[in-house]
Amino acid sequence: MARKNGKDGSGSASDKGGDKAAETKSQAGWRDHPPSFAGWARAAIAGSGTAPSLSPHLHPVLPPAAPGIVTVEPGRSVSLAAIDPDATGGLDKAEAKAALDAQRARIKHLQEMLYAERRHALLVVFQAIDTGGKDGTIRNVLEGVNPQGCRVWSFKVPSAEELDQDFLWRYHLRTPGRGLIGVFNRSHYEDVLVVRVKGLVPEETWRERYGLINDFERLLTLSGTVILKFFLHISKDEQKERLEARLADPEKHWKFDPADLVERKAWDAYQTAFDDALARCSTPYAPWHVVPANRKWARNVMVAKTIASSVSAMVLA
């Protein structure tokens, strides 16, 4: 039976002193190693009784990604250099607009069903190098979707408050509830990408984060959230053309940031970081999808098809 302290409790002075010492030690440990969502996720998964397999009633079986998209096989290495960023998945540019319109209509209708059922949530993650097309993809693919059921989050440099928490805190706060679609424009993967390339944290810190991210995503999955992760893959030459276009067109000047030129010098370092993140964090429950993104019209259709097919599986599960 648990010991009670206070007026009607027992517990000697020495017991209380021991409890106080233990409490102080525990508090010190929390300061040195503050609790995190990822740590809680690991404990929750261990006690869920569902590991290692997923609960079928919580996680629908999703169809393969659209043709042209390369899905990273869990446990396998990946090299972006070996993936053609100009691939179109057999799409014809002349038919792309009609194809995109059709997929957007599907997403709009299926999102309403997802919202009405409130059984699952969808989290769509977009990562890419600068000028990779995250904003354009989100804008073109999700045009017409009811904003009451879809929220886009663009993550910038962490605030002072966010830096006082564990690295996953700000992302978990913005994950979608059941019936909703959440979109991450950049995401928790920045904490194993830009922080690695820029040396913002020790190597041992960012290396440990791969496993913490997998635990975090597994927790979301076990809670009924389907995670679609898209990496928009462009070539170095394509990035150069897009940066030059931003400088040449006054209407695109707002997109240009001189820091982009500095980041471009770290192209190879970013490619290595991308390869590692894609390989280490592509799991059976949240695989990475590499989207050839040099051709924007093909990119949009491939992403739209994959989202539409996934939401269809969710509402029919």
Report the location of each language-model feature.
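Glycine-rich phosphate-binding P-loop
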Residues: V125-L142
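Loop/turn-to-beta-strand initiation segments
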Residues: H120-A121, R178-I181, G224-L228, P287
